[in-house]
């Protein structure tokens, strides 16, 4: 929230931060990013891991000071926060971007931007640098061509329903 005064990852020291679900890669990646940029590890800030929906509830209810959420730019799951009170996205710039060089060498990781005014209630006056990731799907190489075709056809025949229920499919 804008009211927390948190503007960069450096401001997370001593704060309660929701980083994603336990047991998944998101929370681990987020903790790694915070450490690369700031040198802080969990303990320097209070790291919370829970399912995405629960984490969003923690943010809504003020149980955490900051939240990191994987979602495409413009996603409704983020917009809902801006509809209730002013929100700020944490900027990563200058030397902090350079600290992520090694992290960004992994294929599928890059820097992207959230333009100013993307979300109702967004207080950032300028575009905000953010991390972006490529997501993909695959199947076992031993699956028959017929089954692979059936799965692919079912996916694309139902793409509108998939987009409506899964924010990560937003850009498909």
What does each model-identified segment do?
Residues 16-22, 134-142, 172:
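Second-shell loop/turn segments in exported
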Residues 88-150, 154-156:
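C-terminal lobe and pocket-closing loops
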Residues 2-61, 160:
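Bilobed "Venus flytrap"/periplasmic-binding protein-like clamshell domains
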Residues 14, 42, 84-87, 132-134:
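Extracytoplasmic
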Residues 155-171:
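Periplasmic-binding protein-like
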Residues 65-70, 90:
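Paired acidic/hydrophobic, glycine-rich loop segments that form the ligand-binding mouth/hinge
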Residues 53-67, 79-85:
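Short helices/loops that flank or line small-molecule/ion binding pockets
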Residues 29, 77-79, 98-104:
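Short, charged, surface-exposed secondary-structure boundary motifs
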């Amino acid at each position: 929230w804008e009211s927390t005064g948190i503007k960069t990852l450096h401001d997370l020291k001593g704060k309660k931060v929701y980083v994603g679900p336990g047991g998944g890669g998101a929370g681990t990646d987020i903790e790694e990013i915070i450490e690369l940029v700031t040198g802080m590890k969990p303990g320097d800030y209070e790291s919370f891991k829970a399912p995405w929906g629960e984490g969003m509830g923690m943010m809504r209810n003020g149980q955490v000071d900051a939240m990191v959420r994987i979602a495409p730019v413009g996603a409704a799951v983020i917009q809902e926060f801006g509809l209730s009170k002013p929100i700020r996205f944490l900027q990563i710039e200058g030397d902090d971007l350079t600290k992520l060089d090694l992290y960004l060498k992994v294929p599928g990781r890059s820097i992207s931007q959230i333009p100013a005014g993307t979300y109702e209630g967004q207080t950032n006056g300028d575009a905000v640098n953010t991390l972006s990731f490529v997501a993909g799907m695959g199947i076992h190489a031993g699956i028959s061509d017929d089954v692979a075709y059936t799965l692919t056809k079912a996916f694309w025949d139902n793409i509108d329903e998939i987009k409506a229920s899964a924010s990560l499919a937003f850009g498909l």
